Swiss-Prot record:
It comes from Aspergillus flavipes. NADP(+) binds at residue 176. The gene is tndE. The keyword tRNA processing does not apply. It is found in: Membrane. The keyword Membrane applies. Pfam families: Epimerase. This is NAD-dependent epimerase/dehydratase tndE. PANTHER family: ALDEHYDE REDUCTASE II (AFU_ORTHOLOGUE AFUA_1G11360) (PTHR10366:SF562), NAD DEPENDENT EPIMERASE/DEHYDRATASE (PTHR10366). Belongs to the NAD(P)-dependent epimerase/dehydratase family. Dihydroflavonol-4-reductase subfamily. Its main location: membrane. Keywords: Membrane, NADP, Oxidoreductase, Transmembrane, Transmembrane helix.
Length: 363
């Protein structure tokens, strides 16, 4: 690690800390001696995420704060006092196809957080969880081997997301892509125009896999993998997935960590994209994890198709270098190991029934 702008003992605020990525970021910070304050929307979420964090780090400094609506004016003002860094991870993942119910409040909530941060001199870093969909529109044909870089932007999802009703189910994917694109656009416009005293960074992850840390955690995209491993007939949800890349949740968290504390990482878009996504890859990895079971092969069983992958090439040299500085000798975690952790290291009490779309999702 290069020199840090926030040394151990510093306080980091994480929004939506009960979410899959956010909880792993909290664990990485606490493991390194940082204090973490995280927002949740309900007292129940505050209870179980505190249990999950403290079970792993009994002496860690962690506090969950109930904030039902992040878009309320001034709601973050008191929360950011004495905070050294902010990780804005919370996002609506409800798959609601109405852009006014997803994008509008999402942008307002981010704006509220940025404005509150400017009023607190202690804030040194602000990191936004974006998405690969802010860099590339997965529904638009692209030239073979098109290069995706930190300067790539999705310029086509937003018109489709805001087209007039009716809002059918497939519109939800355009709305999500547009939410991430518009959020990051707002984020960097704020940096350019407001010129805050703190440094801003964003992280653009792909399909995130890794261990689900509590039975009540919905698990985001990792839930689809764990459910598929538990029951080979439970793969229908993959039909919704258009992610070209997979990334381990710990690698994703570490890139956020670097954006929060690494002096060398300033005003950057970090691509958290490890390996091409391919549905058939999961069944082949499952065979290695548990060869005693019968797994789907190609198109032959349970509707599993050996499809996916990507026609894009992602320039992740910068992200790999950062991960190596943080002790990840290979850079991104290999696909086999990431899937193994998802399947075997998740809370054994977790079931796919916990993964249900909700309007208050903070994944």
């Amino acid at each position: 690690m290069q020199s840090t702008v926030v040394p151990p003992g510093g306080l980091v605020l994480i929004t939506g800390v009960n979410g899959f990525l956010a909880s792993h970021l909290a664990l990485q910070l606490i493991q390194r001696g940082y204090m973490v304050k995280g927002t949740v929307r309900t007292a129940e979420s505050a209870s179980w995420i505190t249990e999950a964090i403290m079970r792993r780090h009994p002496t860690g400094k962690f506090q969950a704060v109930v904030i039902p609506i992040l878009s309320a004016s001034g709601v973050m003002d008191d929360l950011v006092k004495d905070v050294d860094g902010i990780a804005y991870v919370a996002a609506d993942t409800s798959l609601n196809p109405d852009p006014d119910q997803v994008i509008t409040p999402g942008l307002e909530a981010l704006k509220v957080a940025l404005q509150s941060a400017t009023q607190t001199q202690s804030v040194k870093r602000f990191v936004l969880t974006s998405s690969y969909t802010a860099a590339v529109d997965t529904f638009v044909p692209s030239a073979p081997d098109a290069l995706i870089t930190r300067d790539s932007w999705n310029q086509t999802s937003t018109p489709r997301a805001w087209a007039p009703p009716p809002y059918d189910a497939l519109r939800a994917l355009d709305v999500y892509q547009s939410l991430k694109t518009e959020s990051e656009t707002l984020f960097w416009k704020f940096a350019s125009e407001a010129k805050p005293s703190f440094i801003q960074n964003s992280v653009l992850p792909g399909f995130v896999v890794g261990p689900i840390i509590h039975r009540k955690q919905r698990g985001s995209t990792a839930a689809l993998v764990k459910a598929y491993f538990d029951d080979v007939t439970c793969n229908q949800a993959f039909a919704w997935i258009s992610a070209p890349w997979v990334v381990d949740v710990v690698d994703n968290a570490l890139l956020h960590l670097a954006g929060l504390i690494d002096e060398d990482v300033q005003n950057e878009r970090l691509l958290a994209l490890a390996e091409p996504f391919k549905l058939g890859n999961f069944a082949r990895v499952f065979e290695q994890i548990d060869p005693s079971r019968s797994w789907p092969a190609g198109d032959n069983k349970h509707g599993v198709k050996d499809e996916g992958g990507t026609k894009w090439v992602a320039d992740t040299k910068r992200s790999v270098a950062i991960l190596q500085r943080l002790g990840q000798d290979e850079g991104f975690t290999p696909f086999l190991e990431s899937v193994r952790r998802t399947c075997l290291d998740s809370d054994p009490a977790w079931t796919f029934g916990n993964f249900l779309p909700k309007s208050d999702s903070q994944e």
